[in-house]
C-alpha cells in the first residue's frame, strides 16, 4: 500500500522508525542490505551513509517488520512491496564514491534527479574553489598574483627613468600608470626605482640633487655631475645642451649654498692662525724703510722678515711698528763718517739675534703674554744660563764696573742735553714702554732704570759722533761691557772699537724676551 498523496511511493512507517534509531544502525543495516549487490558496495557503505538522509535509506530495510515496530499496519505491507528501485539505486549510488572514474560516468546516468547536486561535493578539490579555472591554490587568483620583472616590463621603467634623469622620483599617479602598463604592483615599481637610483649613485652617475642634504651625498653628486656633463655634451645636440644649461646652473648654486651648511672647523684654519696677512704687511713695511746704501741692512731686514714670519701671528703688529722705528733711528741717526764704520754693523749685530733666539722665544711663549710668567721665566733663565748668552746689561748684577761706567757718562759729557730730547721721542716707540713691568722685574738695580737707559743711549750716540775725550773716558767701562759680547759675536766688531761695542751692547736683542730691544 503506497501513499501517492505525499508524492513518495514508499510508506511513512520507516521514516518514523529511522527518526528514532541511531546512525550506526542505519549503516549496519544498509551494509547487510547491499551485500548481495556486489563486493564493491560493502566497502563503500560506511562512506555514503552520512551523506544521504536517513529517511531515504530506511526504505531499503526489508528485514524490519513495520507492523511489529508500530502495531498499526499488518505484516504484508512491509514485505509485499519490493521497492526494487531503491535497492538497485543504493548499489548504483555507490559508484559515485568508487575509485574508478569509468564507473562514475556509467552510474551517474541512473542516479535520481534530486540527488545529482550532491555529487559536486566530491570533485578532486572543493566546490567553493571551482570558480577559479587557472589554479587550485584556493586563496589567490592567478590574475592578482605578483609577476616577476621581465625585460619587457623593465624596459618601460628604464625609458621613464631616462626621460626623467633630473628628477627620478615618480609621483603616486605615475607609479600607478607604470604599474598598469607593466602589470606589476606598486611595491614592485617603487622598489625598482629605489634600486635604480641606488645603482646610479654607486656608479657616480647621479644627475639629480639629493633630497636629503647629507655630506656623503654631495661629493658623488658633484663628481657625477662633471662626468655626466662631459658625456651629455658629446651625446646631445647643441640646442638641447643650451636648454639644459639653466637648470644645471641652478643646481650648482644650490650645491654651493648647501656646502656652506656642513662647514668643517677641523679642515679650515681659523683666520687668527694665518701667517700670510702679517707676512705681506711686513714685507710692505720693511721695504718702505729708508735704509743705508750698504747691503747688510737689507740682509738684516730679510732675516728679521723670515724670523717674524716663522714664529709670528696677529699679535706682532705692534712689534713691527717698533721695529720699523728702530730701523729708522738706526739708519738715520749716525751719519756714515770715515772714522766710524759701525753704522751698518750695529744694525747687523742688533738683528743677528733674531733668527737664532727670537723664533724659539716666540714659539715657546703663548699668544697673550703673561707678565708674571715672562718675568719669572726671564729671571730663572738669567740665573741658570751663562753670561756669554746674554748681554751684560740683561744680568741682574754686573758688579760695580758697569754701573759706574754708565753713571759717569752724563757727568763727563757736556753734549748730553742736545740728543736727549730725541732719545725721549724714540723712547716712546721702544718696546720697553709696553714691557715696563717685565723690565722692572729683570733690572733690579735703580741705576738701570729707564731714565738711565735713555741717558746711556744718548751718551753712546754722542760717542759715535765724536770719538774723543768721551770715548777715552768710557774706555774702561766700554771694555768691561763688550767683553762678554766679544765671545757671543766673534765676527761682529773687533776688540779695539769701544764706542761701536757700547752701541751694539745697548742695541742688542735679549734672547729670553724674544722682543726687539731698543732703548
From Swiss-Prot:
The keyword Nucleus applies. One of its GO terms (molecular function) is RNA polymerase II cis-regulatory region sequence-specific DNA binding. Residues 204-298 are annotated as: Disordered. SMART domains: HOX, IRO. Residues 143-204 bind DNA. It is found in: Nucleus. Predominantly expressed in cardiac ventricles. GO terms for biological process: cell development; establishment of animal organ orientation; heart development; negative regulation of transcription by RNA polymerase II; neuron differentiation; positive regulation of DNA-templated transcription; regulation of transcription by RNA polymerase II. InterPro entries: HD, Homeobox_CS, Homeodomain-like_sf, Iroquois_homeo, KN_HD. Belongs to the TALE/IRO homeobox family. Likely to be an important mediator of ventricular differentiation during cardiac development. This is Iroquois-class homeodomain protein IRX-4. It comes from Homo sapiens (Human). The gene is IRX4.
Amino acid at each position: 500500500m503506497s501513499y501517492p498523496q505525499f508524492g513518495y511511493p514508499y510508506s511513512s512507517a520507516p521514516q518514523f522508525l529511522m527518526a528514532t534509531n541511531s546512525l550506526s544502525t542505519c549503516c549496519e543495516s544498509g551494509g547487510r542490505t547491499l551485500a548481495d549487490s556486489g563486493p564493491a558496495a560493502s566497502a563503500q557503505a560506511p562512506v555514503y551513509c552520512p551523506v544521504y538522509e536517513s529517511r531515504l535509506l530506511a526504505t531499503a530495510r526489508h528485514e524490519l517488520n513495520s507492523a511489529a515496530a508500530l502495531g498499526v499496519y499488518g505484516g504484508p505491507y512491509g514485505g509485499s512491496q519490493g521497492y526494487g528501485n531503491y535497492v538497485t539505486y543504493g548499489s548504483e549510488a555507490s559508484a559515485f564514491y568508487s575509485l574508478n572514474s569509468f564507473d562514475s560516468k556509467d552510474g551517474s546516468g541512473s542516479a535520481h534527479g534530486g540527488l545529482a547536486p550532491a555529487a559536486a561535493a566530491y570533485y578532486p578539490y572543493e566546490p567553493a574553489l571551482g570558480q577559479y579555472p587557472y589554479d587550485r591554490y584556493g586563496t589567490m587568483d592567478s590574475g592578482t598574483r605578483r609577476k616577476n620583472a621581465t625585460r619587457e616590463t623593465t624596459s618601460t621603467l628604464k625609458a621613464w627613468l631616462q626621460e626623467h634623469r633630473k628628477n627620478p622620483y615618480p609621483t603616486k599617479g605615475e607609479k600607478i600608470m607604470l604599474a598598469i602598463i607593466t602589470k606589476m604592483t606598486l611595491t614592485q615599481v617603487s622598489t625598482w626605482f629605489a634600486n635604480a637610483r641606488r645603482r646610479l649613485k654607486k656608479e657616480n652617475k647621479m644627475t639629480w640633487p639629493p633630497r636629503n642634504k647629507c655630506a656623503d651625498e654631495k661629493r658623488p653628486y658633484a663628481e657625477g655631475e662633471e662626468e655626466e656633463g662631459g658625456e651629455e655634451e658629446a651625446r646631445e645636440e647643441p640646442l638641447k645642451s643650451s636648454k639644459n644649461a639653466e637648470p644645471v646652473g641652478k643646481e650648482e648654486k644650490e650645491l654651493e649654498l648647501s656646502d656652506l651648511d656642513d662647514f668643517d672647523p677641523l679642515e679650515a684654519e681659523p683666520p687668527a692662525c694665518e701667517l700670510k696677512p702679517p707676512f705681506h704687511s711686513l714685507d710692505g713695511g720693511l721695504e718702505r724703510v729708508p735704509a743705508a746704501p750698504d747691503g747688510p741692512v737689507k740682509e738684516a731686514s730679510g732675516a728679521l722678515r723670515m724670523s717674524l714670519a716663522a714664529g709670528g701671528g696677529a699679535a706682532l703688529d705692534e712689534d713691527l711698528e717698533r721695529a720699523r722705528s728702530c730701523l729708522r733711528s738706526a739708519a738715520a741717526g749716525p751719519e756714515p763718517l770715515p772714522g766710524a764704520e759701525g753704522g751698518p754693523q750695529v744694525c747687523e749685530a742688533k738683528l743677528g739675534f733674531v733668527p737664532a733666539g727670537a723664533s724659539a722665544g716666540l714659539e715657546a711663549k703663548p699668544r697673550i703674554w703673561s707678565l708674571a710668567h715672562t718675568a719669572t721665566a726671564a729671571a730663572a733663565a738669567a740665573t741658570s744660563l751663562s753670561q756669554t748668552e746674554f748681554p751684560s746689561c740683561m744680568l741682574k748684577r754686573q758688579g760695580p764696573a758697569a754701573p759706574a761706567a754708565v753713571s759717569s757718562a752724563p757727568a763727563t759729557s757736556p753734549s748730553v742735553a742736545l740728543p736727549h730730547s730725541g732719545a725721549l721721542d724714540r723712547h716712546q716707540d721702544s718696546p720697553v714702554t709696553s714691557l715696563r713691568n717685565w723690565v722692572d722685574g729683570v733690572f733690579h738695580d735703580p741705576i738701570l732704570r729707564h731714565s738711565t737707559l735713555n741717558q746711556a743711549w744718548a751718551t753712546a750716540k754722542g760717542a759715535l759722533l765724536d770719538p774723543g775725550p768721551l770715548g777715552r773716558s768710557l774706555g774702561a767701562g766700554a771694555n768691561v761691557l763688550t767683553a762678554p759680547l766679544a765671545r757671543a759675536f766673534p765676527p761682529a766688531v773687533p776688540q779695539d772699537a769701544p764706542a761701536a761695542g757700547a752701541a751694539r751692547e745697548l742695541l742688542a736683542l735679549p734672547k729670553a724676551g724674544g722682543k726687539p730691544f731698543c732703548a
